[in-house]
Amino acid sequence: MTEAMKITLSTQPADARWGEKATYSINNDGITLHLNGADDLGLIQRAARKIDGLGIKHVQLSGEGWDADRCWAFWQGYKAPKGIRKVEWPDLDDAQRQELDNRLMIIDWVRDTINAPAEELGPSQLAQRAVDLISNVAGDRVTYRITKGEDLREQGYMGLHTVGRGSERSPVLLALDYNPTGDKEAPVYACLVGKGITFDSGGYSIKQTAFMDSMKSDMGGAATVTGALAFAITRGLNKRVKLFLCCADNLISGNAFKLGDIITYRNGKKVEVMNTDAEGRLVLADGLIDASAQKPELIIDAATLTGAAKTALGNDYHALFSFDDALAGRLLASAAQENEPFWRLPLAEFHRNQLPSNFAELNNTGSAAYPAGASTAAGFLSHFVENYQQGWLHIDCSATYRKAPVEQWSAGATGLGVRTIANLLTA
């Protein structure tokens, strides 16, 4: 490894030779980042991306002004899926260094897991990786159950089984119980439900190549809620939380589900499949039924669910949906504290009725008459949350993954949302 390039911070503008808008300058001692007080964390992240683009793979964050948030902003921009990078961190107090180390361990796990090729990360591997991460931070305070294949059908998990049966890799439900109280009768404070589609071809409603080439990332919701629980534990979470990951491939085969199929769920709802590429909501429904059965104060589901959310928000914000205004406000406050981007989109009672079917209670996708795709998807999920008007948040993870690099991010997963959900759990 080469000698480290020193990176320092300054509140003074760059020398005029670098231009009036320069955010960094190069000198004999290394590189100086010039903070202007407007968006210092964003400036640091963008500068780190540029430094990586120069081919500098070994840096030392040096001098005054560095704290955990600024170090983390640098790493968010500096990290990329290819190559090895080394950062020598500045001296931080014990609490800040622990916070930074926990972010590096857990949020990097989220990014690396989402970036993993689908060939090496199937449903079973995703579930086991989640167990390993949570067990690493929680020890014996965790128990779990993995249900897969035909056992899912026999136990009534018909959405997950239906979507996943077309793959040679069995669908999997992970039910994990973090119980720091040690009391088996302790109430469940929160349930987290994640969409874990480890590859999404679209099924018989097959995607075009341009929309399929990033579908290894369709398990981003599952990775995000797993990381959020792990991170909340490192921040002292002392309440019982259950995690449900609904993991499957959505592939084409002679055994794959078809348009016109009808799925009957354990809560009695019948759903007609009119688009096999709207599979995420079908698997999440099973997890939400289980979550509701725990009678928690809070249910949060996270999923890379709709293209409509990305159309509205790009990859810059996660989309938030809820009937509970106070709870949505708490989540947005947590996002502001953690400097993570969330934006609330509409969800009203009428969205629940915009999925009509001639053969079942619900259709799994909206029609031309009801084009608000992200809102109708959230409305669909609400049919599987027992008390959907209170205590439920749906996150459509539009900021989880970038197909191409931008000025502040490399291509690939971002890890955004982990800290916000953890903040809400520990508030």
Swiss-Prot record:
Family: Belongs to the peptidase M17 family.
Function: Probably plays an important role in intracellular peptide degradation.
Record's subunit section: Homohexamer.
Positions with a binding annotation for Mn(2+) 2: K195, D200, D218, E279
Organism, scientific name: Escherichia coli O1:K1 / APEC
Binding site for Mn(2+) 1: D200, D277, E279
InterPro entries assigned: Leucine_aapep/pepB, M17_PepB-like_N, Pept_M17_PepB, Peptidase_M17_C
Protein's recorded name: Peptidase B
